[in-house]
Amino acid sequence: MDPRAPRRRHTHQRGYLLTRDPHLNKDLAFTLEERQQLKIHGLLPPCIVNQEIQVLRVIKNFERLNSDFDRYLLLMDLQDRNEKLFYSVLMSNVEKFMPIVYTPTVGLACQQYSLAFRKPRGLFISIHDKGHIASVLNAWPEDVVKAIVVTDGERILGLGDLGCNGMGIPVGKLALYTACGGVNPQQCLPITLDVGTENEELLKDPLYIGLRHRRVRGPEYDAFLDEFMEAASSKYGMNCLIQFEDFANLNAFRLLNKYRNKYCTFNDDIQGTASVAVAGLLAALRITKNKLSDQTVLFQGAGEAALGIAHLIVMAMEKEGLSKEKARQKIWLVDSKGLIVKGRASLTEEKEVFAHEHEEMKNLEAIVQKIKPTALIGVAAIGGAFTEQILKDMAAFNERPIIFALSNPTSKAECSAEECYKVTKGRAIFASGSPFDPVTLPDGRTLFPGQGNNSYVFPGVALGVVACGLRHINDSVFLTTAEVISQQVSDKHLEEGRLYPPLNTIRDVSLKIAVKIVQDAYKEKMATVYPEPQNKEEFVSSQMYSTNYDQILPDCYSWPEEVQKIQTKVNQ
């Protein structure tokens, strides 16, 4: 069956309420027959249009608006009104709309979320619901949920503790699960766990929609998380994917290690960021013509993103034949207190793994001059951290320096694409976390900065995991994903400065990632969906969400003529 063909869908809804159901509403695309039989004739203008015209109308309204925040609100209103049309709009130009529904605009939306809140798009579960989380989950109208994105709002992008306002992240993330990965949106559930906030402005804001007290921590917090994980898995199944998003460093690794072997879970800030960064590095190596194990990598930042990338680089270097110990020696990290070295005070267990025998240093410029890295990766959300001197030094040490400014949003980027290319005279191999415009150099070349967006990773991973019912998600999934992404980058893309496939191909990239995950899952006996499909690509494709409107008219058909004869008299 062609997955693009209209699907027949049964509903008891009729009349006005049907037009208020975003899963069923077609707006002006309802045919005359549908309008009459579904009792909505007269509620809509007489004009009947197809979805293509509807998309054009949305884009026209979108382009009339002056701010990205207003554009975000327009798209969120559309999602609340007509789900199929919303995703059709996103998929019509992913490169244009992704920065609005996700980074960088979603950061501004989260800061304004208390003002922008209009209707429920997910579940808010507070610490005071402890002991009753299963009951709160019952409030969600969908019985089948295969993917959850959950946050506690403590570390939203590079913006810090936004508490309940962080709900914009799970909502935006799951929108990309569907637009980029084809995961059914009705099977996705955004959740915010509200345990309070340390944000003074929010605590004093009378319009703040969350709990107005300090964050609950320690054993009570852990018991709350344990209950949530147990309740969600009990209700939706042990194969329900639970993605952790924007938890603070002190909890992110701890919770991942605690739950990864019991539930189907991953942390996108750690593992997703790692995968997309390593994908960029693998693509960059096709330019430098050497191996990953030949690199010396310096991180500005030592939080969950940096450590996640570092661990995946080690795994990739091991695959090239290097020992774990030697691989770790090629990785250096700088945190807020300076270079991470052995004997330095207050090192966490995760940071200790990458501590070197070296003198203590604090100044990043001096550290770069001393270490002479071949690759410099920024994930500390310190805007402008890669100074002109650092960029000059990187270009002096390397013919083709690898410079990744991965912090979000744009204001937190370590340097801009233009700064990087101009200082290095176009020799830098650059990638960023937020989008930057193409840069034209004095010699006439135009370079297109690669955007190392996690959206290349998590939609495909989610699609693959959900499709085959993968029970646990290990780190090899993310190395495999990085390899698949890098393989989609053509030589022409590399010449243009792109380290990632064009965003308009992201749905195809996600399909390839998902198919590889499904293949490996069955090969390693980790899948739970049986019988095993013979054609894995066809199997995954058949499960991808279609934006074509469903057929919701009653299933009408005829009987044979002889049985339809009207009896007019009783036989004696």
Curated annotation (Swiss-Prot):
Residues bearing Phosphoserine are: S336
Q: Give the binding site residues for a divalent metal cation.
A: E245, D246, D269
Query: Taxonomically, which superkingdom?
Result: Eukaryota
Active-site residue list = Y102, K173
Point out residues bearing the modification N-acetylmethionine: M1
What is known about the tissue distribution of this protein? Answer: Ubiquitous. Up-regulated by 3,5,3'-triiodo-L-thyronine in the liver, kidney and heart.
- Write down the required cofactor(s): Mg(2+); Mn(2+)
* Chain residues that bind NADP(+): 155, 269, 301-318, 408
Record-stated family: Belongs to the malic enzymes family.
Name of this chain's protein: NADP-dependent malic enzyme
Upper lineage: Eukaryota, Metazoa, Chordata, Craniata, Vertebrata
Which gene does this sequence derive from? Me1
